[in-house]
């Protein structure tokens, strides 16, 4: 069996500025699959609807992953499956953005703070207003499908150790991150398929959760291991409260999002070390 949940909490910097939470997360479960998402709307001034962009990204990836059939793994190669998923996810997200823009175009109030140069760029590409990262994972039988664009991550968990499911992005200009809203998003949306039988679980999170720990080793020991123990003990309320505290007090002021899907009944000896 699989135990799973996601949690998003607003960061204290957004509380101070009276800004809404720009992260979004969701989980979906049925008899065949479990899906978790963690999306981070960009904080730059041009991304005036990033809180919606992150929601659309989460909805898009859940919708597309729900359509994957077990027979697809026999009909197509893993490369073909990944390429098809990549295209479908981006098309779904862009369709949601276009529909929202058609129903409610950018208002003067939303763009009042922008310089003429940034306003011009936004008018040329209004989908930039919805800029967001996307991290998601689906347990599907004995397969694990991982999806990521931008910072944050999808993290594999096995016997108390963790590893990135997808490689880190190369350094970008001015420390920016790749985004669902960029024209070449297809080139940067990464998808990988693993055999889940070799793993204990999978984690998705935004950078607001990872960054306060400064290293993956510290993140593993101070966050992942204790969380895995708590979720096996059914202490989700404690996990929920801790993630809220990271956003409001402990972290760097950014919104924080965390999701986990983990096998039940596994040996926890290595998580207690």
Question: Which residues does each PLM region occupy?
Answer:
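Helix-loop-helix
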Residues: 59-101, 217, 221-245
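Short helix/loop capping segments that flank catalytic or ligand/cofactor-binding pockets
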Residues: 46-47, 147, 156-157, 212-214, ...
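N-terminal entry segment of metal-dependent catalytic domains or homologous docking segments
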Residues: 1-67, 152, 184-186, 191-193, ...
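Short acidic-glycine loop/turn motifs at beta-strand connectors
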Residues: 29-32, 139-142, 150, 157-161, ...
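Short hydrophobic beta-strand that contains or immediately precedes a catalytic carboxylate
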Residues: 36-40, 147-149, 203-205
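Catalytic core of PPM/PP2C metal-dependent serine/threonine phosphatase domains
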Residues: 74-155, 189-196
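C-terminal catalytic subdomain
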Residues: 176-273
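PP2C/PPM family metal-dependent serine/threonine protein phosphatase catalytic domain
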Residues: 5-19, 107-127, 131-132, 156-197, ...
């Amino acid at each position: 069996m699989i135990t799973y949940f996601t949690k998003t909490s607003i960061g204290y910097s957004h509380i101070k500025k009276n800004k809404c939470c720009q992260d979004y997360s969701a989980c979906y479960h049925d008899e065949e699959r479990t899906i978790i998402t963690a999306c981070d709307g960009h904080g730059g001034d041009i991304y005036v609807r990033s809180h919606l962009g992150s929601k659309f990204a989460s909805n898009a990836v859940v919708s597309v992953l729900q359509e994957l059939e077990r027979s697809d793994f026999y009909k197509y190669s893993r490369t073909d499956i990944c390429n098809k998923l990549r295209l479908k996810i981006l098309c779904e997200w862009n369709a949601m953005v276009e529909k929202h823009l058609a129903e409610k175009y950018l208002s003067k109030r939303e763009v009042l703070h922008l310089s003429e140069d940034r306003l011009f760029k936004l008018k040329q590409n209004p989908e930039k207003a919805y800029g967001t990262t996307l991290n998601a994972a689906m347990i599907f039988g004995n397969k694990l499908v991982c999806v990521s664009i931008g910072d944050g991550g999808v993290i594999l968990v096995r016997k108390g150790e963790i590893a990135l499911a997808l490689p880190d992005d190369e350094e970008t200009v001015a420390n920016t991150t790749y985004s669902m809203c960029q024209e070449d998003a297809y080139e940067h949306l990464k998808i990988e398929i693993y055999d889940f039988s070799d793993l204990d679980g999978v984690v998705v999170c935004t950078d607001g959760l990872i960054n306060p720990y400064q290293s993956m080793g510290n993140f593993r020991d101070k966050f992942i291991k204790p969380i895995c123990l708590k979720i096996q003990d059914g202490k989700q309320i404690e996990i929920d409260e801790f993630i809220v505290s990271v956003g409001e007090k402990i972290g760097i002021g950014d919104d924080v999002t965390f999701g986990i899907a983990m096998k039940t009944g596994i040996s926890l000896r290595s998580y207690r070390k």
